[in-house]
Amino acid sequence: MGQQWPAGEIARLILDGFDDYREHFRQITDGARVRFEQAQWQEAQRASAARINLYEEKVAQTRERLLEGFDESLLEVGQWPLVKSAYIALIDLRFDDELAETWFNSIFCSLFSHDLISDGCMFIHTTRPSLRNQPSAAQTRNYRPAGELHLALQAIFDDYRFDVSYEDLPRDLQRLEGQLRASLPDWICKDPQQCIELFSSVLYRNKGAYLVGRIYTPDEQWPLVIPLLHREGLGIQVDAAITDEAEVSIIFSFTRSYFMVDVAIPAEFVGFLKRILPGKHIAELYTSIGFYKHGKSEFYRALIGHLASTDDRFIMAPGVRGMVMSVFTLPGFNTVFKIIKDRFAHAKTVDRKTVIEKYRLVKSVDRVGRMADTQEFSDFRFPKAKFEPECLAELLEVAPSTVVVEGDTVLVRHCWTERRMTPLNLYLESASEAQVREALDDYGLAIKQLAAANIFPGDMLLKNFGVTRHGRVVFYDYDEICFLTEVNFRRIPPPRFPEDEMSSEPWYSVGPMDVFPEEFPPFLFADIKQRRLFSQLHGNLYDADYWKQLQDAIRAGKVIDVFPYRRKSPVE
């Protein structure tokens, strides 16, 4: 039967589904330039969400075509190694073969239960090289200043033109040259072998466009990112020259929306990014350019590789125990694993379905650098020996429907992964006075920037925010988030009688979406000193009118600027 079984036809239909997905992905991505040129910011947000949702839509369509096109023998899992072999032959000459493997995995998982997953039937381990050789000449552009940096910059912007003119290119190039000379060692700008290498395609995200590359000599290199802004009615402005690796890393952060960029050979571009950002895992780099499912595949491979090669064992994550989620981690792997508890604390009114919807919402909204990206997994299987006994006991106690022991294996039926950060409340306990001020200032900015993106965190307690390795404050607990425009911000009405103020119950009605910002200070800060400092830094967050003005701007269609980098000398 094996030779008669239609392995080749099944493989072909799976790949046809992938081609359909890739074509629609390209169409959405290719529209980014026009949206930037025409300042279509709301359309850009919709396109970003549509591209994220596209993957699951096309997987579902391909699954249906398979079920309609083949009889029940399609679900004979023992035959799927033949499909995998036929599929490998079909993708061997493709430029996006690693993405095609992930697509195959998605189709397999849509047809079979996760306990049937094996490397014989799908691509648990890739058959492709993890990184490719240097990008081809067509993928990058090279400029050699030979001591004449201003001429090289002029040549760059002769090549990177748009259908909208630059607002004042001579002014911007002069400022750009000054920033480069200030940020690089003096000798580098005089080195006759200095080269500026830029990726040929422009990267687009939200209201910005980005030239991405590096400055290098035979001995050293620096990343280079040049953000461009479209100042409506004026033209395009060259906004900055960024050469600091930490700052460039933040631009490609797990807290950002995904870039739109025309990439003919994804592995080559990721390899290019990896050379300028060696600290980034390729999972994060694939995700940053919209291939989040392949980023998930690379993350999983890194995880099973870590478990196989170390003595690391799962422990409960540091911090206050959550009322909805239970969080565990591996000390040597920079990730937390979040599961939904079977029973929530009485203070929580959400249910499991709502929590799942909230976490999935985060995937499709603009995270403005202030919400951690998540990956959702089903049926993780780990060796029981990889759990500290106290950790496993707690997980089994709070989530017995999600965490199950099967012999020597622990099955985690459903979880999310997020980048591990230091909880803000723990960070403040050991921070210096200057660090406390900086962290609280960034905490307030995080709340304001989320609000500008039409996101209200709901539960804004310090424990629900984390501090990244770059010192940025990021929100990561999503069970109460909602759109800002759904909230009814109110002032507390004056008491009717003196005894009203002494009552344990409010003397006014409170609706389910009512929020009283005046109540924030004691709710957010038990520490009086921190409460006073935050009032100095961001006291307007305690004013209902501040929030209402933001709501008005959002309802009017205004897309507010949130920059993923320090603006050094913006033009007003």
Curated annotation (Swiss-Prot):
Catalytic residues, chain numbering: 373
Protein keywords: ATP-binding, Cytoplasm, Glyoxylate bypass, Hydrolase, Kinase, Nucleotide-binding, Protein phosphatase, Serine/threonine-protein kinase, Transferase, Tricarboxylic acid cycle
Top-level taxon of origin: Bacteria
Catalytic activity: L-seryl-[isocitrate dehydrogenase] + ATP = O-phospho-L-seryl-[isocitrate dehydrogenase] + ADP + H(+)
Main location: cytoplasm
UniProt binding sites for ATP: 317-323, 338
Recorded GO CC terms: cytoplasm
EC number: 2.7.11.5, 3.1.3.-
Subcellular location: Cytoplasm
Gene Ontology BP terms: glucose metabolic process; glyoxylate cycle; tricarboxylic acid cycle
GO molecular function: [isocitrate dehydrogenase (NADP+)] kinase activity; AMP binding; ATP binding; phosphoprotein phosphatase activity; protein serine/threonine kinase activity
NCBIfam families xrefs: PRK02946.1 (NF002804)
Family: Belongs to the AceK family.
Role, per record: Bifunctional enzyme which can phosphorylate or dephosphorylate isocitrate dehydrogenase (IDH) on a specific serine residue. This is a regulatory mechanism which enables bacteria to bypass the Krebs cycle via the glyoxylate shunt in response to the source of carbon. When bacteria are grown on glucose, IDH is fully active and unphosphorylated, but when grown on acetate or ethanol, the activity of IDH declines drastically concomitant with its phosphorylation.
Designated name of the protein: Isocitrate dehydrogenase kinase/phosphatase
Organism: Ectopseudomonas mendocina (strain ymp) (Pseudomonas mendocina)
Top-level taxonomy: Bacteria, Pseudomonadati, Pseudomonadota, Gammaproteobacteria, Pseudomonadales
